[in-house]
Structure formats: structure tokens, C-alpha cells
Amino acid sequence: MLGKLLAGIAVSGVAAFAADAPAVTFHKDVEPILQANCQSCHRPGQIAPMSFLTYQATRPWAKAMKAATAGRKMPPWFADSAYGHFTNDRSLKQSEIDVISKWADHGAPEGDPKDAP
């Protein structure tokens, strides 16, 4: 009985903490990552098949972006970082991949356009 009570308290504490965590939004969190690493190709007239210049264009691709970045397929980078740092390296940091994943997992919210970079 005590074990169930403690487990219930722990679960409710985690849920309360998660509810207080700030939401990851497109304009505040994801758009800066896209501008720095993705939009040179993901724009009209460039090599990528879809544009990531606006929320409306990007939103349908949220789950695919999560999968591609988590698998390190995107952004493409074929040099081996074990051999040094490369000037044009657009590889995402794990923290950036985590932001994209959280954004996709929480329904890819737009957020406030005033938060855009």
C-alpha cells in the first residue's frame, strides 16, 4: 500500500514538473536552428524538396524532421569529426536535436511570431 502511495506521489510530481516546463515553440526555439543549419537548402529554388522558411511550410514536416535529425541524416555532413573541426560543419548539436524532437513530440506549436530571430 505504501509503495503504491509513494509511486503515485512520484508520478504526480513528475507530471507537475513537466507541466511547468516551458514549451518548445517554432519561432523561439526551432527557427533559429533552421536558419543556421537548414534554410540554405530548404528554400524555394534550392536542392531540398521542401521549404523551412515559414512555420506553415515547416509544420507538416515536424515528425520527419525529428526522425532525420535524430538519425543524423540531416543536415547532411559526411566528414568525420574524429579528424578535426571543419569550418562549414552544419552538424547539429545534441541539444539542437533534442529541441526539434521535443517540438515535434508536443504537436509542433508555433509560438509567438514576435519571438522569431
Residue map of PLM features:
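Bacterial N-terminal signal peptides
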Residues: 3-16
